[in-house]
Amino acid sequence: MKINNLILLFFIGLVPLQSINAAEYRLGLSMHDVERRIEGGAAISLEKIFDRPNWWHPYAGRPHIGTHLSTANNTHLLYAGSTWNLFQKGKFSGELAFGAAIHSGQEDIKKDQLGFGCRVNFREMIAFGYQIRKDQLLQVSAQHMSNGSLCDPNQGLTSVGIRFAWKIN
């Protein structure tokens, strides 16, 4: 799946969510594939986290949709899921996210190439943040995408980086 298709899917995915108020946007820069270093370079991420709609289960966190784009044109992700606040202590906070990701990488493991087993995988993220202003947050985050051994063997993809978040409403 080419990067243009992933970007198009990201914006198409936002259309049905327009009725949900946006809580915040996040822009990030991360080291891509820190675990195996088969795919090097940086990745840029863009994420939109929504306020929890009335019909959303109260324990399901806040819905999010985002993309993770490799600057070296390796594996790109389009993902969606839920984000939970773990703690808020003064200006410090923590959060956890879980959902699904569609990737542009290979499914089979090959020499010098990551393989992810199936096209759609699980995606988890943990982040710790510092509130710069009332509507701005700086986070250190780590995300991992893997199929959880539900399909063919996979190597997973782990990225670590920083994100800037700003609240809209």
Model-derived features with residue positions:
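Cleavable N-terminal export/targeting peptides
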Residues: M1-A23, N169
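Outer-membrane beta-barrel architecture
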Residues: F11, S45-E47, G81-T83, A127, ...
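Short loop/turn motifs that connect adjacent beta-strands in outer-membrane beta-barrel proteins
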Residues: S19-A23, D51-G61, F87-G94, D135, ...
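Transmembrane beta-strand segments that form the barrel wall of outer-membrane beta-barrel proteins
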Residues: E24-D33, P58-T71, A142-S146
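Outer-membrane beta-barrel translocator/channel fold
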Residues: L29-H32, I38, W55, G94-M125, ...
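Solvent-exposed loop/turn segments connecting transmembrane beta-strands
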Residues: H32-A42, H68-L78, Q88-G90, S149-Q155
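Outer-membrane beta-barrel "beta-signal"
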Residues: I44-L46, I132, G156-N169
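Short, well-structured hydrophobic secondary-structure segments
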Residues: R52-L86
